[in-house]
Amino acid sequence: MRSRKIPLVVAAAASASMLLASCGGGGEDDGATTGTLDFYTNKAAWEPDFDELNAASESRADITLNTTGYSDAEQYDAFVRQSFRTDKSPGLFTWQTGPSLAELVEEDLIAETTDIWTKAVDSGWVSTDLRETYTYDGKQYCVPMNIAYWVMYYNKNIFAEQGIEEPTTWAELNSIAERLTGAGITPYYQTSTLFTFQWFQQMVAGTDPELYEGLSTGEVKYTDPRIVDIMETWLDQEEAGWFSDAGSTTDPAVGLKQGDYAMINFGSFFNGSLDGAGMVSGEDYDMFVIPATNPDLEQTPVAVESGPLCVAENSSQKTLGLTYSEWWMSPEAQTAWSEARGDVAFNPKATVADPMLEELGTTVASDDYQLYDRYYEATPTPILTVALEQFGAFIANPGDPMPFLETIQAEADDYWAEQE
C-alpha cells in the first residue's frame, strides 16, 4: 500500500489541542456494549438525521449517539488527528475513504472491522466490491456511513417528447446525444468548477477499470495514449455541442427541470435536489446506470462514493463503537437511516422510501455491475487538486488535451516520487 505525508493544519490543530489539552495517551477500552456513544462528524447539517436515528438504535441496539458536528472541514480533521494523541479518541467518527483513510490505518489508529464485514457479506447485506474500498492489506477498517452511485439522471418529459428510451449500450447513449442535438436540445450538463471529473471518470473506467485504477496508483500516466484517446473523444463531444454552458450559474436541478439540458451525471444523492426543485421522482425525472464505453466488459462499472464511519483503536469506547458499527450494517439500521436521510441504502435488503433509489441499490448489487471508487476519493489529494483545475479549464475552453494532461502528469510525477 502506498502512503503519503500527512499535511499539517497548524491553526486548526492548535484549536483542537486546546480542546483536548494534555490528556495523555489513549484511553483503555471499557468494554461496554450499550449506552451513550460519543460520535463526531464533519457533516454538521446531518445532526438532526442522526438524532432521528437514535429512536431505532436505542430500541434495537440499546445505543444512543451523542453527536457533535463540525462544519469546518480543516478544523474537524485537525481535531480528529489530535484526539488520537489523547484519552479522548472518538468511539465513532466520520472520515474519508482513499488515501486519507489509508494514512490512519497505516498508523494503527483505526479499529479493524474485518469480522463485521465478513458477517455483512455472508448475510448479503453488502457487496464484495464495496468491501474492497475499506480493505487495506487484506483487512477491513470502518464501515460505510452512506453511499452514492454516480448515474445518469434525465428529464422524462424530454425523453418522451423525443421518443427516447433508456440506453443499454454506449452506442445507444451516443445516438441519443446526437438525436437531442439535432432537435436543438443540449444532451448533457457540465460545469467548470469542482464537479469537473465525472465524464473523465466515466469514460476511463467504462473503457477499462484497470486503466482507471492505474491512474490512482501511479502505474498509468495521464499522458498514456489510451488516456489521450479518451480525452480526444471527449473533445469531439464538446465540439459537437453535447454539453451545456460550463459557466452557467443556474442550479443544476433547476436546469434539468426547465430543459436547459436533458441529462446530468451525478451521485444518487441528487434526488433530494431534484425534489427540492419541484420535480417528482419517477414522473418528472428518472435515472439509469451509464453503459460501459467498452461493450466487451463483462460487468458495467459504476462509480461509488462512500463516506466511512470509523472507530479509534485507542478509544475508551472502542467496543461500543464496534457494536454500533455492526448494527449499522443491518437491514433495520439502513432502513431507518434511509427514512431519516432519504438516501439510497448500501444494504440491498433494506427498505428505501424512494422506489427509484431502492431499485438502484438492488440493481448495482447484482453480479452484472462492478463498483469502483469515485475519482474524487480514488485520487491522491495533490494530484486531484491539479486535475480538477485542468479538467475545468478543458471544459471551459475545449482544445488539444495534451497540455492539460501533461500538467496533471507533472504533479503526479512529483507526488509519486515522494512516495518512493
Which residue stretches match the model-derived regions?
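Hinge/lid segment of periplasmic solute-binding proteins
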Residues: 98-150, 174, 282, 286-288
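Glycine-centered hinge/linker elements that transmit conformational signals in sensory
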Residues: 179, 217-246
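Conserved N-terminal structural module of periplasmic/extracytoplasmic solute-binding proteins
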Residues: 2-102, 166, 279, 290, ...
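C-terminal capping/gating helix-and-loop segments adjacent to ligand/active sites or protein-protein/ligand interfaces
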Residues: 343-344, 361-413
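Extracytoplasmic/periplasmic solute-binding protein
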Residues: 137, 141-145, 150, 174-220, ...
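A structural signal for short loop-to-beta-strand junctions that line the ligand-binding cleft
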Residues: 82-83, 90-91, 122-157, 186-187, ...
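Short, solvent-exposed loop/beta-turn-alpha elements that line the ligand-binding surface or hinge
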Residues: 114-126, 192, 208-229, 276-280, ...
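Extracytoplasmic/periplasmic substrate-recognition and gating elements
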Residues: 228, 232, 240, 277-340
